[in-house]
């Protein structure tokens, strides 16, 4: 039919929703998860309602991501998502890009930023992690999105489990992968690479002791409390991002995803930042060796030296400043 043509990831969403049949509750909850992840320029946690006062009952966000939004190992999250029984949504709304905002509170302080990949490529990364692919096996051509997912051979249980996994990886992505700021703000400058995470805050309005504590999730605090480690990780990740700019060249990111997923239970540990930095430095050296030297271990001549080598040297000079 005439009109706007659906993108491949929207068709994929429709194929998955079809697996729920007449089960409107599960279909609606699936759509909530998918839409939250597809709002790619916003932290996924911000797309779920949270309590406004400390004395209130936990809402979706706390139930899924934990009190301080640091839970990455959640399971059975369909039980934690609200179902709006009388909600009526047009098919265009369900398949479209805008999440239903009447049931969520949207923070304003996460700013405007650009991710290192787009949503279709992210889906391919998540699928490959889900299937346990090695780095050399992962396919990142978004034209193959529908074929790689092969939904006709998947059942409802697979869709539910994959959507939970998708949300898990998006939450990790939001907090542990660099982004590039599109605007100046109190916590970052335009065009600056940054690594910040959602953080729990509570305060009493106007500093009055008798007032209820207001609670918020703010997105302006560095992911790692050690500023030197946070800066190192930003420089290492951004070095890969500015070298391999095409979505289909983001295997470097897949290696990082694999590492983060393997260490999902350690992400909140105090020493994890140093462990993560060490992993990235070893990865950077490996990439440099593969690109700086010929097969007989000689340094490549000027015309054959790839861009990555210059970016790597910049990092080494910064570290040894």
Task: Give, region by region, the residue ranges found by the protein language model.
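Flexible coil/loop and intrinsically disordered segments
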Residues: 1-321
């Amino acid at each position: 039919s005439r009109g706007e043509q659906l993108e491949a990831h929207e068709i994929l969403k429709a194929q998955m929703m079809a697996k729920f049949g007449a089960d409107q509750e599960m279909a609606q909850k699936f759509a909530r998860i998918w839409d939250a992840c597809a709002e790619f320029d916003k932290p996924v946690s911000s797309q779920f309602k949270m309590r406004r006062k400390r004395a209130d009952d936990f809402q979706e966000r706390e139930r899924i991501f934990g009190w301080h939004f640091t839970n990455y190992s959640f399971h059975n999250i369909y039980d934690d998502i609200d179902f709006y029984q009388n909600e009526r949504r047009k098919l265009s709304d369900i398949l479209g890009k805008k999440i239903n905002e009447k049931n969520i509170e949207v923070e304003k302080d996460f700013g405007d930023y650009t991710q290192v990949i787009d949503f279709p490529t992210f889906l391919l990364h998540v699928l490959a992690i889900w299937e346990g692919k090695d780095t050399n096996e992962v396919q990142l051509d978004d034209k193959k999105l529908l074929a790689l997912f092969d939904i006709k051979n998947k059942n409802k249980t697979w869709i539910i489990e994959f959507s939970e996994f998708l949300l898990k990886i998006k939450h990790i992505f939001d907090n542990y992968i660099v982004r590039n700021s599109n605007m100046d703000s109190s916590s970052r400058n335009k065009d600056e690479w940054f690594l910040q995470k959602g953080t729990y805050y509570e305060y009493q309005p106007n500093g009055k002791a008798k007032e209820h504590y207001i609670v918020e999730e703010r997105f302006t605090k560095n992911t790692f409390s050690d500023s030197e480690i946070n800066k190192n990780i930003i420089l290492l990740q951004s070095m890969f991002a500015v070298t391999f700019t095409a979505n289909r060249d983001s295997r470097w990111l897949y290696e990082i995803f694999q590492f983060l997923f393997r260490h999902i239970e350690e992400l909140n540990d105090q020493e994890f930042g140093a462990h993560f930095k060490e992993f990235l430095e070893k990865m950077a050296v490996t990439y440099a060796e593969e690109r700086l030297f010929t097969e007989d271990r000689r340094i490549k001549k000027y015309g054959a030296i790839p861009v990555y080598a210059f970016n790597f040297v910049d990092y080494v000079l910064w570290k040894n400043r």
